C-alpha cells in the first residue's frame, strides 16, 4: 500500500498530477519533475529502511542469489515496456502539450504490445485494454466534474478565502503562544506562524483527501489549501507539492487508509494492524 501510494508522488507521471501542475503553475514539465525527485527519494528510502528493520525483527529473509531473476534475461524480455514511458517523458520534456504526450504514450503502448515477441498482446487483449481505459477515463472524468463543482463553490462563495483566513489567524495565535515559551533567539513570529500553518494545512489535506482519486485530490487541495500557504509567502510550486503530498498520504493514514484496506484484502491480513 505504501509503495503504490509512493508511485503517485514519483516523477515522471506522479499519478497524472504532473500534467495538472503544468496547467495550474504555468511552468515547464522539467521543473516539476526535478522538484519531485528528491522528496520521492526520501519517501522510498524511509519506506525501505522501515521494511528492512521490520523484516529483521520478524526474521524474514530475502531471495538467495540462486533464486534472484537474472538481470540480463529480465531486461532482454522487458526492455520494450520502457518505450512508452520514454516517449511520454520525451514529448513532455520537449515542451509539447500533455495531450500530445499522452497520445504518444498510448501509441507506444499499443505498438509495444503488438510487436513485443516476449509478451505479445492478442487483438482481444487490446480490445479489453481499450475498454478498461475508457472505464477509467469515465471514472476520472466524473470525479473531475464533481471536483469542478466543489472548486466553483469554493471560488464563488469565498469559502477558500475564509478557510485561509481561519488557518492564518489560528496560526498567528499559536505562534504567539509558542513565542512566549521559546527563547528569543528562536521566537521568529513569521517562522512560527508558517510552521503552525503547515501543520494545520497538512491535517486538513489528509482529512479532505480520504478516499479521493489522485487527480481529484490534487484539484481539491489546490483550490482549498494551497492559497493559504501562498499568502504566507510560500512559493507556489512548493505549496502545490505540499498540499498534494499530504492529500495523497490520506490513502495510508488511519482511520480511513483505503490503500491499507485494499492491501490487507489481498494479503488476507487484519487492516487494523
Mark where each language-model region is.
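Core transmembrane alpha-helical segments of multi-pass membrane transporters/permeases
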Residues: 99, 103, 125-165, 190-207, ...
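Long, contiguous bundles of hydrophobic transmembrane helices that form the permeation core
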Residues: 34-136, 260-273
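Residue-level recognition of pore/gate-forming positions within transmembrane alpha-helices
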Residues: 4, 23, 39-40, 44, ...
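Membrane-interfacial loop-to-helix junctions in multi-pass transporters
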Residues: 76-82, 134-140, 167-201, 230-238
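Alpha-helical transmembrane segments of multipass membrane proteins
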Residues: 5, 16, 20-24, 86-90, ...
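Hydrophobic alpha-helical transmembrane segments
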Residues: 33, 82-83, 103, 195-200, ...
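Hydrophobic alpha-helical transmembrane segments of multi-pass integral membrane proteins
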Residues: 173-225, 243, 250-253
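Alpha-helical transmembrane segments and, especially, the helix-loop junctions at the ends
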Residues: 1-30, 47-52, 209-219, 243-265
